[in-house]
């Protein structure tokens, strides 16, 4: 008999008489493939419609950011003095605040308690030409309307008349053209337009708004140089080194330049360089989006491109033959590729946001820089682990050995032992040697002979930095040699600005590196390779291994196949993902520790502290972690509190959540099942309490679910703890 209970998408689960119904229902809510009566066409339609919901949420969120800053922030005051005014994210109202808390949180010129923004939105909005609260409100209302449009579009595409067909979803060439030209290309062109027409004039003290944007020329010659082919005119007369951002003082007329380096006052990339960059991307992508064959019978067919990719000698198999259908028919493969790309790009954003700051005055807001770097690195880690998870699901659910005979996928599976054992060798080598060096150095420090430490200069990395123009090492190579071909070729175009930037201590582009950097670099390499080993092994063994050849029949996540086979626990693809996330968090911990400590030393003008203490483990524990957590450990005491008290509490609370995770990770379900049965007995025997009864019989979580719950607590606690540490230690030092 059909039941109306949750989950509606699975009658089997809905009829389960235990609490398993709820937890399994939540676990498979997004696994559309497994839902009752799901067809391939319906699967694609559901996912397509959900994308609109995702976009609606994103636009609503950004709209909310704009709205709260316009309503409760101090954007107009901040614009007048970005160096000294602290940007306000929003007001705080809390009935628990005592007088000291109200005073501590009343900052940035506000009349009551507020949160300080560390997201960089003030710098971003200022750079792109916003100046007033009215600008922010207008943007907020516009984005809220866009959000509503996307919600409607999502609903519309679930209606029978507006649901695209399966063939439409499988039309790879049309989708590529649309995404390349339509999304990447045209949006980059639109952004160039905004920078040229609004942001650059505002940076030169000329307001452009809805009232005058059609009559204000972004360049004195208008479109004449474009039509006449004299494009160089747009690069002539750029802003000078003495340009005061936001005013006409020292400003020029150029709109598309190749100056290199940073604006001396704001320490951010030149707006005219960024406009040029986006224009170039727009041209490339709009051209790229016309390469694939659709309606007119011209252009490339992806299947033909892939089938032609066969190694010429014949000794390397069938190359990319069969890949078109394999990728085009597997959503997990496509998602894996997308996540791998987006994850890599997100990590690159983390690196670029501090080394090449695009937003005015971001370089002097140290807390925001640290927060943005850490935020993007953590997100990159989770996304990249997800790429391998979906790669493994592809191998279990979608991979067809017959359709991929001898091609690159089949060959990777055939060579998996070699791949996995090489990764294992690399991790062992990196781990033992790096730890060996650190521990040796610790022992030398402990025994009072620091001069006996093994300190290795990263000469290859310094050589690469010198080639890019860093002169401090005295290598006299390529761009660091004024007479080299590389230097003379770019001297009149982009080099003066770049060379000034790379050798200037005002920014953190190409940091000077030494033995401490060499060691932590290899520690991070160990973390990356170990994470990769676990993920790659999980995906390549997902279909089966010598130990368990029929593994794919058990699905993505199974605890084990009973006691009879011996040793089939902990080898599902999900278990590999689960283990890899711990290593990912561990690695990103080292990455963010390195970034943060290196920058704290630079920002304080005390690089010797990092250089001397980073070569041994006690240095990291004592001079980075302990020294910088002192304010948090003493956060609120009998003598009062301060604006860091909330972070001190968050630091404590993060540890608590993290520790709770181990309760799920170290015990198995038998313990909990016994405990639950005892509690059920007590409940049934207690007068009054036993009047209340449950519809679902309480049972313990499954092994797989408990691992997930433990992992989530571990991850959330880990991130809360480090976020509190990072923001408090940075803002406590620099205000």
Curated annotation (Swiss-Prot):
Listed transmembrane segments: 47-70, 136-159, 176-200, 274-292, 331-354, 370-396, 418-440, 518-536, 576-597, 644-666, 708-728
Classification of source organism: Eukaryota, Viridiplantae, Chlorophyta, core chlorophytes, Chlorophyceae
Reactions this protein catalyses: reduced [plastocyanin] + hnu + oxidized [2Fe-2S]-[ferredoxin] = oxidized [plastocyanin] + reduced [2Fe-2S]-[ferredoxin]
Localization per Swiss-Prot or TrEMBL: Plastid, Chloroplast thylakoid membrane
Membrane topology: Multi-pass membrane protein
Main location: plastid
Enzyme nomenclature, EC number: 1.97.1.12
Protein name according to UniProt: Photosystem I P700 chlorophyll a apoprotein A2
Organism of derivation: Chlamydomonas moewusii
GO MF terms held by the record: 4 iron, 4 sulfur cluster binding; chlorophyll binding; electron transfer activity; magnesium ion binding; oxidoreductase activity
Job of this protein: PsaA and PsaB bind P700, the primary electron donor of photosystem I (PSI), as well as the electron acceptors A0, A1 and FX. PSI is a plastocyanin/cytochrome c6-ferredoxin oxidoreductase, converting photonic excitation into a charge separation, which transfers an electron from the donor P700 chlorophyll pair to the spectroscopically characterized acceptors A0, A1, FX, FA and FB in turn. Oxidized P700 is reduced on the lumenal side of the thylakoid membrane by plastocyanin or cytochrome c6.
Cleavable signal peptide: none
Family: Belongs to the PsaA/PsaB family.
Ligand binding (phylloquinone): 672
Key words of the record: 4Fe-4S, Chlorophyll, Chloroplast, Chromophore, Electron transport, Iron, Iron-sulfur, Magnesium, Membrane, Metal-binding, Oxidoreductase, Photosynthesis, Photosystem I, Plastid, Thylakoid, Transmembrane, Transmembrane helix, Transport
NCBIfam families, per database record: psaB (TIGR01336)
Binding site for chlorophyll a B1: 655
Residues involved in [4Fe-4S] cluster binding: 560, 569
Domain of life from the UniProt record: Eukaryota
Record GO cellular component, one term: chloroplast thylakoid membrane
UniProt cross-references to Gene3D superfamilies, sorted A to Z: Photosystem I PsaA/PsaB
Pfam families: PsaA_PsaB
Cofactor: how bound: P700 is a chlorophyll a/chlorophyll a' dimer, A0 is one or more chlorophyll a, A1 is one or both phylloquinones and FX is a shared 4Fe-4S iron-sulfur center.
Keyword match Cytoplasm: no
Subunit (UniProt): The PsaA/B heterodimer binds the P700 chlorophyll special pair and subsequent electron acceptors. PSI consists of a core antenna complex that captures photons, and an electron transfer chain that converts photonic excitation into a charge separation. The eukaryotic PSI reaction center is composed of at least 11 subunits.
Gene Ontology process terms (BP): photosynthesis
Entry binding sites for chlorophyll a B3: 663, 671
